[in-house]
Amino acid sequence: MYAIIETGGKQFRVEEGCKIFVEKLAADAGSEIAIDKVLMLGGDKFAVGAPYVENAKVTAEVIEHGRGEKVITFRKWRRNDSRKKQGHRQDYTALKIKTITA
């Protein structure tokens, strides 16, 4: 059984036991969270939400918080001897999917 969930403005296809990286959540490492924004359920209990599936829930365990790879932005102005280099690392939360209930 799988589900498509929405968190942090993005959609993820999850199954029980899989590990996903989502935008940073305000939860401690080792705690469990419940995600009720389930857009679709697949498998035996197929259901499509409008926009969310009623009484569907995905529980996940917070594994860790971290920062992603550095993304470099570079801008150069020609003939001015001017340039701008900037780096960014996005915060993330690693989740392990425990159960999918419908």
Swiss-Prot record:
Q: One MF term in GO for this entry?
A: structural constituent of ribosome
- Cell cycle in keyword set: no
Q: Name one GO cellular component term.
A: ribonucleoprotein complex
Q: Which UniProt keywords apply?
A: Ribonucleoprotein, Ribosomal protein, RNA-binding, rRNA-binding
Recorded superkingdom: Bacteria
Any keyword Transferase? no
| One of the GO biological process terms | translation
Q: How does it assemble?
A: Part of the 50S ribosomal subunit. Contacts protein L20.
**What family does the entry list?**
Belongs to the bacterial ribosomal protein bL21 family.
Which HAMAP family does the record associate with it?
Answer: Ribosomal_bL21 (MF_01363)
Q: What is its biological role?
A: This protein binds to 23S rRNA in the presence of protein L20.
The protein's name: Large ribosomal subunit protein bL21
